[in-house]
């Protein structure tokens, strides 16, 4: 993304263009009216990554145009990023510029912030980081007491205080707390994330019984939805995300959610009866689980055939998609057994062609 792509005066038009593109792609499917959830036009991203460009005595943040990836675009401020990131950007450079051990071979800075004012700053180097660097970054941390710092160089990660922030999302007036770990997946647009959670709660308001969730991440959906169901069993392949999910379940006081570390393909094979149930699923009580709803939030590749066959067996499907093309293919595969009753577009990534889509399906009457 180029910084000049952020044009607040064009926000509504780009939103309408996205809506039209999504409607065109999905035109061959039988869908209800699209619900559209707009983002804030500026300061919506809670995380951002910048290259660091060294030009003589000068030092500045840089972004690049994919059409010209060799030419840096000086980025002193970034309207897409949170206000806290924009506040920290010049202060950090001023603090690093005259400290050789912090400046030398620094090539990237990553910011992760929260709605509650926390910040985690990762400094990435093309050199080893050593005791001298550690002493200097400790002094830097003293100058930024509300921030946490991480140093990264080849095969090394140095944590100063901690490598995560605690985010709070407000959903229908209720606050939910989430650990978000550096370099792990979280939705970048907190405002849209809150709207997605509210929508998920709304479409499942008549649900009962149990929930099966696949690709649960850090428990983003699992935790608010837990109050809708008797039991929730959620699966996730990333060890870091599983650990965060378990912590988040505890700090939010949820006692009916269990998270299992397992790839979706293995979950599908086990629950479809193709292989024996692994011990982790047995311990989670999957044999006694009676899901009325399954929630899937797959990567851009969408759902594999075995997972489609698994979720086909469940009466209601809540599908969160980051790729409308693979979503369309999966919906076509499910069309013989299920119909879409709710359909929403979430502008998680303004000024880009990317969208998040949510659909809620119910089994067709026999």
Curated annotation (Swiss-Prot):
The keyword Transmembrane does not apply. Keywords: Methyltransferase, S-adenosyl-L-methionine, Transferase, tRNA processing. It catalyses: uridine(54) in tRNA + S-adenosyl-L-methionine = 5-methyluridine(54) in tRNA + S-adenosyl-L-homocysteine + H(+); uridine(341) in tmRNA + S-adenosyl-L-methionine = 5-methyluridine(341) in tmRNA + S-adenosyl-L-homocysteine + H(+). GO terms for molecular function: rRNA binding; tRNA (uracil(54)-C5)-methyltransferase activity, S-adenosyl methionine-dependent; tRNA binding. The active site is at 322 (nucleophile), 356 (proton acceptor). GO terms for cellular component: cytosol. Its EC number is 2.1.1.-, 2.1.1.35. S-adenosyl-L-methionine binds at residues 187, 215, 220, 236, 297. Dual-specificity methyltransferase that catalyzes the formation of 5-methyluridine at position 54 (m5U54) in all tRNAs, and that of position 341 (m5U341) in tmRNA (transfer-mRNA). HAMAP family: RNA_methyltr_TrmA (MF_01011). NCBIfam families: trmA_only (TIGR02143). This is tRNA/tmRNA (uracil-C(5))-methyltransferase. It comes from Marinomonas sp. (strain MWYL1). The lineage of its organism: Bacteria, Pseudomonadati, Pseudomonadota, Gammaproteobacteria, Oceanospirillales.
């Amino acid at each position: 993304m180029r910084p000049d792509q952020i044009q607040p005066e064009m926000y509504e038009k780009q939103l309408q263009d996205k809506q039209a593109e999504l409607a065109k792609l999905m035109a061959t499917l039988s869908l209800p009216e699209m619900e559209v959830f707009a983002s804030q036009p500026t300061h919506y991203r809670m995380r951002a990554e910048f290259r660091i460009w060294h030009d003589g005595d000068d030092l500045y943040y840089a972004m690049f145009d994919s059409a010209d990836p060799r030419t840096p675009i000086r980025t002193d401020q970034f309207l897409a990023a949170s206000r806290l990131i924009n506040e920290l950007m010049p202060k950090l450079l001023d603090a690093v510029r005259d400290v050789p051990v912090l400046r030398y071979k620094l090539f990237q800075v990553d910011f992760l912030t929260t709605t509650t004012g926390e910040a985690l700053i990762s400094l990435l180097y093309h050199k080893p980081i050593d005791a001298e660097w550690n002493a200097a970054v400790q002094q830097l941390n003293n100058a930024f007491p509300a921030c946490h710092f991480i140093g990264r160089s080849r095969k090394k990660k140095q944590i100063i205080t901690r490598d995560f922030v605690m985010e709070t999302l407000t959903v229908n007036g209720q606050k939910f707390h989430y650990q978000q770990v550096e370099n792990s997946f979280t939705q970048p647009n907190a405002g849209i994330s809150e709207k997605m959670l509210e929508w998920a709660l709304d479409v499942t308001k008549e649900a009962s019984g149990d929930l099966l969730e696949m690709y649960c991440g850090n428990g983003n959906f699992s935790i608010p939805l837990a109050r809708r169901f008797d039991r929730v069993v959620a699966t996730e392949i990333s060890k870091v995300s599983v650990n965060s999910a378990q912590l988040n379940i505890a700090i939010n006081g949820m006692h009916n959610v269990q998270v299992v570390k397992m790839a979706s393909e293995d979950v599908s094979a086990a629950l479809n009866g193709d292989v024996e149930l692994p011990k982790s699923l047995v311990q989670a009580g999957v044999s006694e689980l009676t899901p009325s709803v399954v929630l899937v939030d797959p990567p851009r590749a969408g759902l594999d055939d075995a997972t489609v066959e698994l979720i086909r067996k469940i009466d209601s499907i809540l599908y969160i998609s980051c790729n409308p093309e693979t979503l369309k293919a999966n919906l076509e595969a499910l069309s013989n057994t299920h119909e879409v009753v709710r359909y929403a577009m979430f502008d998680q990534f303004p000024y880009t062609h990317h969208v998040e889509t949510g659909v809620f399906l119910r089994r067709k009457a026999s």
